[in-house]
């Protein structure tokens, strides 16, 4: 090492400056972040493209790889792109080309590919040396007019080439094909849309720039995915359009086919899947769920997809509900998926979050700039051509002199000097201007010096004109046609007038944009692929539950369960029946009713509170199952028992819950008052000391009410109440003692029509009740029946049953309507043979009847096998009972279950235990 080298190194070391590592990292990271954001990850709001997409299309355009030309090898295009414009790996460029050619990834493909470009199953494309591509026809609309100085160009990475910084696209590519990308600290995810819908929104915004975003959303409505499927619910979509961030829920499109001659089995066929879902992985996921027994209703799974379309077949087991399995697939697999909207784009080189209207407005602003720049370019070109035409006119007017001048000049330079040095005769130029109706200034190209052109002395040629004359051959000079020159000049003048008019009138630019958008819509518009279900939403547990009629049983010890009604076949009267539930010693089933799995169970307790729960949430068990303690299903206080249960589907304002207590008190409350029940329950009725709730039923406000006592008596009255101006507030507490004596005097009088004066006034949940039936000391209400007055003509009858298993059916008409508060009349004999009355219900001739004993035995029998008798008759044997066993409940199973909507039975409810 020489001394000079040492001195040089020492000098270099002395010039080293200390730098803060923190500052350097911050600066370098920000530079890198902005490079990724602007140069790689985010699309430009104007043309909807990221740099790599733009460079691919421009390279194909430069190679004239047009839609109607021969295909070129993908490797050729990749080489041009990375060599001229995109200094990155070839795989990144080829992956971009592949995606732009996939009809399941792009709503409108921008590249026409030939060969294997991958599949919806996630299969990779063939290598670039095997595939061939060319531009799709619609891609030419993105590059239209690019040679007319419509967009800015910039140098490529090494300054050897120039590339467009944006494309002059004629349609809103950003929305039409969408975009996705992950930058540093931000990301974008924009779904594709239907071209027709998007252009219609642009046209609306062109006509009315102040159009509200809601109106634009009404036009576009939702994304339109290349794989079709169904947009499920519009709440998240609208949020995304309004704020730039939202969520699109997508469901695969399916249909259900029967299997077998009788259609005893079904299959689900998947025709379309959500956007960006891998079909092979979807099928694999379904198979895994079947193997794990998470999905138990599927017997076979196969993919029958081919070139004609998608077809994934899911065969179901016998008696499986296809709709329920389908909802399980939606919940557990990507057959239902979501697309997160995050519309972050580059606006003037800066990342911004835009809403739908802002994106459309930015596109239209871009189109306005493109049309303006294109018109300026064409005006400049027309003026230049006019300038050249004037050269021809001058040459024709002075042809002999010009030929002589050229011949006498020793070289071209001297000839040019002579042409520029003097004015020339300009009669033909003046004639052309006169015919066109334009002044000379409108024709002058920009930048032309003042002493050039038509002057008083004649016409002074420009250097461009002189060069053009010298380049003309003698044959061309002598062959100039005056008429042709004048006609050509006139056409140029017309174009110039038009271009100047366009530039001076913004409305003309707007019309040009409109016409071009209409043309795009006509040439490329199509129907939506994705259907829209505006009322969709997240899948609730209820969607996965089949609608079935269930027998709900509640034991005296508080065990509840459900069983399908199909578990029981009708038997002849007097049979032994099937075991409905295994009960513990000294426990028995006291309540039984039929409800749909999607019904709400309104559970009213002996303490006058209300709880509710969906039927499908109750434990389902076999005949040997006890069920689950009801206090594990709903929150009950110590000493609180469910004493009445009502099954309802909805909570309309014009319906009521009618209550009856053991001491004969009645009350009604609007059903809607119970639609929001707290976990610990809400108060339903205020009870007097020693009283407890017996029954509850849904009524329409003018139903007939029947109360049955354990002593075999019944009373029938109408609930209708006609409000008068003197009535107190409907939700005020009702004093039960005030009018009892007055009511008793008239209660047993005949009352054939509801008067509205002796009915039951609606009250609030916290109030008490009115006397419905007067009882002796040993009497208590055991059953409540409600029905519409016209039911009397329907053929339905009152069936009563006693503790010792006897019963009968009696026409409703045998029970005359009375005023409420009376002692009632005989319904069935309650002597030693029959025992106390335990339950009553309405039945039809073709119905079945379910009977339940204290031993847990259940029998289903035909009503027609039970003899019809009068009110005073003792009845017939309904069920054979073991010694010490009693009948505790019954339930009608209607031939048409819809008939049950007006009737309810809750029977044999026990008194609350006394506090110690």
UniProtKB/Swiss-Prot annotation:
Q: Which domain of life is it from?
A: Bacteria
Please list the residue ranges annotated as the Topo IIA-type catalytic domain.
42-544
Q: What class of enzyme is it?
A: isomerase
Membrane-crossing residues? none
One biological process term in Gene Ontology? DNA topological change
The residues responsible for catalysis, as annotated, are 130 (o-(5'-phospho-dna)-tyrosine intermediate)
Question: Which intervals of the chain are annotated as region Disordered?
Answer: 739-774, 897-916
Q: Where is it localised?
A: Cytoplasm
Report a single Gene Ontology molecular function: DNA binding
Place the motif GyrA-box on the sequence: 571-577
Alphabetized UniProt keyword annotations: ATP-binding, Cytoplasm, DNA-binding, Isomerase, Nucleotide-binding, Topoisomerase
Recorded hits in Pfam families, A to Z, give: DNA_gyraseA_C (PF03989), DNA_topoisoIV (PF00521)
Primary subcellular site in the record, as a coarse category? cytoplasm
User: Biased-composition ranges for Acidic residues?
Assistant: 739-748
Q: Does the keyword Nucleotide-binding apply?
A: yes
Q: Which family does it belong to?
A: Belongs to the type II topoisomerase GyrA/ParC subunit family.
SUBUNIT field: Heterotetramer, composed of two GyrA and two GyrB chains. In the heterotetramer, GyrA contains the active site tyrosine that forms a transient covalent intermediate with DNA, while GyrB binds cofactors and catalyzes ATP hydrolysis.
In terms of HAMAP family, this protein maps to: GyrA (MF_01897)
Q: What is noted besides the main data?
A: Few gyrases are as efficient as E.coli at forming negative supercoils. Not all organisms have 2 type II topoisomerases; in organisms with a single type II topoisomerase this enzyme also has to decatenate newly replicated chromosomes.
Indicate what this protein is called per its UniProt record. Answer: DNA gyrase subunit A
Q: What is the lineage of its organism?
A: Bacteria, Pseudomonadati, Pseudomonadota, Betaproteobacteria, Neisseriales
Which gene name does the record give? gyrA
């Amino acid at each position: 090492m020489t001394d000079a080298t040492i001195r040089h190194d020492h000098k270099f070391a002395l010039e080293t400056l200390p730098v803060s590592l923190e500052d350097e990292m911050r600066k370098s990271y920000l530079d890198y972040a902005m490079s990724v954001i602007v140069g790689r990850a985010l699309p430009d709001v104007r043309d909807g493209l990221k740099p790599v997409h733009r460079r691919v299309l421009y390279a194909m355009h430069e190679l004239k790889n047009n839609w109607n030309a021969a295909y070129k090898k993908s490797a050729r295009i990749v080489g041009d792109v990375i060599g001229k414009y995109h200094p990155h790996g070839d795989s990144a460029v080829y992956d971009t080309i592949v995606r732009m050619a996939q009809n399941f990834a792009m709503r409108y493909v921008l590249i026409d590919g030939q060969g294997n470009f991958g599949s919806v199953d996630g299969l990779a494309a063939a290598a670039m040396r095997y595939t061939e591509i060319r531009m799709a026809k619609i891609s030419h609309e993105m590059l239209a007019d690019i040679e007319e100085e419509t967009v800015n160009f910039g140098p490529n990475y090494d300054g050897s080439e120039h590339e467009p910084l944006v494309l002059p696209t004629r349609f809103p590519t950003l929305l039409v094909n969408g975009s996705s990308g992950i930058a540093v600290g931000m990301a974008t995810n924009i779904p594709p849309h239907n071209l027709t819908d998007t252009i219609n929104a642009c046209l609306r915004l062109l006509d009315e720039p102040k159009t509200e975003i809601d109106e634009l959303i009404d036009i576009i409505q939702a994304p339109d995915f290349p794989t079709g499927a169904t947009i499920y619910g519009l709440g998240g979509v609208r949020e995304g359009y309004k704020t730039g961030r939202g969520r699109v829920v997508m469901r695969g499109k399916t249909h259900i086919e029967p299997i077998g001659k009788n259609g005893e089995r079904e299959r689900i066929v998947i025709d379309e899947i959500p956007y960006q879902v891998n079909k092979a992985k979807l099928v694999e996921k379904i198979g895994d769920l079947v193997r794990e027994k998470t999905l138990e209703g599927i017997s076979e799974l196969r993919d029958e997809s081919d070139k004609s379309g998608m077809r994934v077949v899911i065969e179901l087991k016998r008696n499986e509900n296809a709709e329920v399995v389908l909802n399980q697939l939606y919940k557990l697999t990507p057959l239902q998926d979501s697309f997160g909207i995050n519309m972050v784009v580059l606006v003037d080189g800066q990342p911004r979050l835009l809403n739908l209207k802002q994106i459309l407005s930015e596109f239209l602003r871009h189109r306005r700039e493109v049309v303006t720049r294109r018109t300026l370019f064409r005006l400049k070109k027309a003026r230049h051509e006019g300038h050249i035409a004037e050269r021809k006119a001058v040459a024709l007017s002075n042809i002999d002199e010009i030929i002589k001048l050229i011949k006498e000049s020793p070289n071209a330079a001297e000839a040019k000097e002579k042409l520029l040095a003097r004015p020339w005769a300009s009669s033909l130029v003046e004639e052309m201007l006169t015919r066109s109706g334009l002044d000379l200034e409108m024709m002058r190209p920009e930048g032309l010096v003042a002493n050039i052109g038509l002057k008083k002395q004649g016409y002074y040629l420009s250097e461009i004109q002189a060069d053009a004359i010298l380049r003309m051959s003698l044959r061309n000079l002598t062959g100039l046609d005056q008429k042709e020159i004048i006609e050509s000049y006139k056409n140029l003048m017309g174009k110039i007038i038009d271009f100047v008019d366009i530039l001076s009138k913004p409305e003309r630019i707007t019309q040009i944009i409109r016409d071009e958008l209409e043309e795009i819509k006509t040439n490329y518009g199509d129907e939506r692929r994705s259907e829209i279900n505006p009322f969709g939403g997240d899948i609730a547990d209820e969607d996965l539950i089949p609608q079935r009629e269930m027998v709900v049983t509640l034991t005296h010890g508080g065990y509840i369960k459900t069983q399908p009604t199909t578990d029981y076949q009708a038997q002849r009267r007097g049979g032994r029946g099937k075991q409905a539930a295994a009960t513990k010693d000294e426990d028995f089933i006291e309540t039984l009713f039929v409800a749909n799995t999607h019904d709400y169970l309104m559970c009213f307790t002996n303490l006058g509170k209300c709880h509710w729960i969906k039927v499908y949430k109750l434990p389902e068990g076999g005949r040997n199952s006890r069920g689950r303690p009801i206090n594990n299903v709903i929150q009950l206080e110590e000493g609180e028992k469910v004493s009445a249960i009502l099954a309802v589907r909805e909570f309309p304002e014009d319906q009521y819950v009618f209550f009856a207590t053991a001491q004969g008190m009645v009350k009604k409350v609007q059903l809607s008052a119970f639609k929001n029940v707290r976990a610990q329950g809400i108060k339903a009725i205020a009870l007097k000391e020693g009283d407890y709730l017996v029954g509850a039923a849904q009524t329409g406000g003018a139903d007939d009410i029947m109360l049955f006592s354990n002593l075999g008596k019944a009373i029938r009255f109408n609930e209708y109440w006609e409000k008068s101006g003197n009535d107190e507030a409907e939700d005020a507490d009702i004093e039960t003692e005030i009018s009892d004596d007055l009511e008793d005097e008239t209660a047993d009088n005949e009352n054939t029509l509801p008067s509205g004066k002796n009915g039951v006034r609606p009250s609030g949940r916290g109030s008490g009740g009115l006397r419905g039936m007067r009882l002796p000391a040993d009497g208590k209400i055991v059953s409540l029946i409600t029905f519409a007055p016209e039911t009397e003509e329907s053929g339905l009858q009152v069936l009563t049953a006693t503790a010792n298993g006897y019963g009968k059916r009696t026409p409703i008409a045998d029970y005359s309507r009375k005023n409420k508060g009376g002692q009632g009349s005989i319904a069935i004999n309650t002597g030693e043979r029959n025992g106390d009355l335990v339950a009553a219900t309405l039945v039809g001739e073709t119905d079945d009847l379910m009977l339940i004993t204290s031993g847990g035995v259940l029998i289903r029998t035909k009503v027609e096998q039970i003899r019809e008798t009068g009110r005073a008759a003792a009845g017939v044997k309904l069920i054979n009972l073991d010694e010490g066993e009693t009948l505790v409940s019954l339930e009608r199973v209607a031939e048409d279950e819809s008939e049950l909507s007006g009737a309810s039975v809750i029977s044999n409810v026990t008194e609350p235990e006394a506090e110690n």
